[in-house]
């Protein structure tokens, strides 16, 4: 399969730079996986699409202010993007500089350069940085960090992004990008879903900066996925198995929830799904056999991204590309702050040939 098979024309004007005034007021394009039928509506229509006993699985990661600015003590400006927090004093990060710092280099971080840190080691493209400060990494980031808005949101981060670029149920700090499908859920909608009898469970996947990296190979089978840490605890496993047993659906909110659940299913030895606490490099593209997820809530993704490949594996390639074409024609808003899709699984997707 070629990466270019997943390309589509997207006018710049359809990229959302700000969220809707109300989280749940965005548009919703529903795609029936088996038939490819499309329905246009608003996000609150989700309430009518879910049945009592269906299980919604959310990702409760919380975005950290992961972008830092400063300079090397020896001179030269730097930009640091945290990939993950290693412990209370150390981070693994991408560093942008005219000349990469060497191990032992002193860094002065923050708009006032008040935070002292040392680049201690290099791991491939990533740099290990240790803060010389009595505060924890998280406290330092909250103090001097900027929200790491995606590269296609072409504006500086604003104070409002600290809440708008978080889900209302975010709990565990560690992501450098929001699980954006969850941004559309507000408390009134969650309350209505609970009142209807829709069950809810929470996985954790700390989204890494790699989620924005373009696929740099021509053939997608050659692509190596970035690694992200995921947690699928026992209570989620129990909820999934119970939903399946009573004939209800497991609905993943976002591709990160999909990747968490399907990683746990891949690693399971004795059951459909078992608890999972580990890094995952799962790469889902057409031909992938889904084991857990029956329906998906997701945003519109970048052309040629691993995420549109994941959706194509779920709904079928042709159905997915047709839906994206319709979304462009109907002027849906794209990417992190954009509109959403509700997609049901297409069991025939696994047999579909792509790009032939």
Curated annotation (Swiss-Prot):
Family membership: Belongs to the QueA family.
PANTHER family (alphabetical): S-ADENOSYLMETHIONINE:TRNA RIBOSYLTRANSFERASE-ISOMERASE
Misc note: This reaction follows a completely ordered sequential bi-ter kinetic mechanism, with binding of preQ1-tRNATyr followed by AdoMet to form the ternary complex. Products are then released in the following order: adenine, methionine, and oQ-tRNATyr.
Name by which UniProt lists this protein: S-adenosylmethionine:tRNA ribosyltransferase-isomerase
Chloroplast in keyword set: no
The protein's enzyme class: transferase
NCBIfam families: PRK00147.1, queA
Classification via Gene3D superfamilies: QueA-like (3.40.1780.10)
This enzyme's EC code(s): 2.4.99.17
Chemical reaction(s) catalysed: 7-aminomethyl-7-carbaguanosine(34) in tRNA + S-adenosyl-L-methionine = epoxyqueuosine(34) in tRNA + adenine + L-methionine + 2 H(+)
Ways its activity is controlled: Inhibited by S-adenosylhomocysteine, adenosylornithine and products.
Pathway(s) this gene product operates in, as recorded in its UniProt entry: tRNA modification; tRNA-queuosine biosynthesis
GO molecular function, one term: S-adenosylmethionine:tRNA ribosyltransferase-isomerase activity
């Amino acid at each position: 399969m070629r990466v270019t098979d997943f390309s589509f024309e997207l006018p710049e004007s359809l990229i959302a730079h700000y969220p809707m005034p109300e989280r749940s007021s965005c548009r919703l394009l529903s795609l029936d996986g088996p038939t490819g039928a499309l329905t246009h509506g608003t996000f609150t229509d989700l309430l009518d699409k879910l049945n009592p006993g269906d299980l919604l699985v959310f990702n409760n990661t919380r975005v950290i202010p992961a972008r830092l600015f400063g300079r090397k003590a020896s001179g030269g400006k730097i930009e640091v993007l945290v990939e993950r927090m290693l412990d209370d004093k150390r981070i693994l990060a991408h560093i942008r500089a005219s000349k990469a710092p060497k191990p032992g280099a002193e860094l002065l971080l923050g708009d006032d350069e008040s935070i002292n840190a040392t680049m201690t080691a290099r791991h491939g493209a990533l740099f290990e940085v240790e803060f010389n400060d009595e505060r924890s990494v998280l406290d330092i980031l909250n103090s001097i960090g900027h929200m790491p808005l995606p590269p296609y949101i072409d504006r500086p981060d604003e104070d409002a992004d600290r809440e708008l670029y978080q889900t209302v149920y975010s709990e565990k700090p560690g992501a450098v990008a929001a699980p954006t499908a969850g941004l559309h859920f507000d408390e009134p909608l969650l309350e209505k879903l609970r009142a209807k009898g829709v069950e809810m469970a929470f996985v954790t996947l700390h989204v890494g900066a790699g989620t924005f990296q373009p696929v740099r190979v021509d053939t997608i089978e050659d692509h190596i996925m970035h690694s992200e840490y995921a947690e699928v605890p026992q209570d989620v496993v129990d909820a999934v198995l119970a939903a399946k047993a009573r004939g209800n659906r497991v609905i993943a909110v976002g591709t990160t929830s999909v990747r968490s659940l399907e990683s746990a299913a891949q690693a399971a030895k004795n059951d459909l799904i078992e608890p999972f606490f580990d890094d995952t490099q799962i790469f889902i593209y057409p031909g992938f056999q889904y084991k857990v997820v029956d329906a998906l809530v997701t945003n519109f993704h970048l052309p040629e991204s691993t995420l549109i490949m994941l959706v194509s594996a779920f709904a079928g390639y042709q159905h997915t590309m047709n839906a994206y074409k319709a979304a462009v024609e109907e002027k849906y808003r794209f990417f992190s702050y954009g509109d959403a899709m509700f997609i049901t699984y297409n069991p025939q997707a696994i047999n579909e040939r792509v790009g032939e």
